[in-house]
Swiss-Prot record:
Homodimer. Residues 1-12 have a biased composition (Basic and acidic residues). GO terms for cellular component: cytoplasm. It comes from Mesorhizobium japonicum (strain LMG 29417 / CECT 9101 / MAFF 303099) (Mesorhizobium loti (strain MAFF 303099)). The gene is grpE. Its main location: cytoplasm. This is Protein GrpE. GO terms for biological process: protein folding.
Length: 210
């Protein structure tokens, strides 16, 4: 092969090598951009999956709480109505004069005992369904659980101490079915300062009255 032919072929081979290098570089750049794009999409998918998982967990917790509340408070309205019946039974018993109770009439005594047993059985049934009695005599007055009816001058106990329960209250779970109606001490020594009281249970009766 002549020197002239070699000289003509050399530039062609150099140009081809340069073009091939450019194609390779372009391919690498394209692959890198695709990799960056895929990594970004992967991060977005991971973030979306985490959000969905968090939403599902929140939904599970809300559902569990709703089911628990439904089971706990399903009888709340019925229990409140039954408390009114229990109050009437107790008023009927309290209205019977002592001499009448002490009389020797067997039939009358049996009637009194029947009414008393009925009231106790009703309260026992409510207690089995989560209803608890609030009898706060001697405790510090708490508006979350108690309703003050009057004040009693009593220097022997701290002010705002419950000294008399006019009507017991009742709660179910963390809710107050009916606050205890009480009389509180007035004029005694002040109760020592305490830590801030956490919000109490929902007072359904107070909200209903409002």
């Amino acid at each position: 092969m002549s020197d002239q032919a070699k000289d003509e072929r050399a530039p062609s081979e150099a140009e081809a090598a340069e073009a091939n290098a450019e194609r390779t570089e372009g391919s690498i750049d394209g692959d890198y951009e695709a990799l960056v794009r895929l990594l970004k999409e992967n991060e977005e998918l991971k973030d979306r999956a985490l959000r969905v998982a968090a939403e599902m967990e929140n939904l599970r917790r809300r559902t569990a709480r709703d089911v628990h509340d439904a089971r706990t408070y399903a009888v709340a309205n019925f229990a409140r109505d039954m408390l009114s019946v229990s109050d009437n039974l107790r008023r009927a018993l309290d209205a019977i004069p002592a001499e009448a109770k002490a009389s020797g009439d067997a039939g009358f005594k049996a009637l009194i005992e029947g009414v008393d047993l009925t009231e106790r059985a009703m309260l026992s049934a409510l207690e089995r369904h989560g209803v608890k009695k609030l009898a706060p005599e001697g405790e510090k007055f708490d508006p979350n659980f108690h309703q003050a009816m009057f004040e009693v001058p009593n220097p022997d106990v701290p002010a705002n101490t419950v000294v008399q329960v006019v009507q017991p209250g009742y709660s179910i779970g963390e809710r107050v079915l009916r606050p205890a109606m009480v009389g509180v001490a007035k004029g005694g020594p002040k109760i020592a300062a305490e830590a801030p009281v956490e919000p109490g249970p929902v007072n359904e009766q107070a909200e209903k009255d409002a």
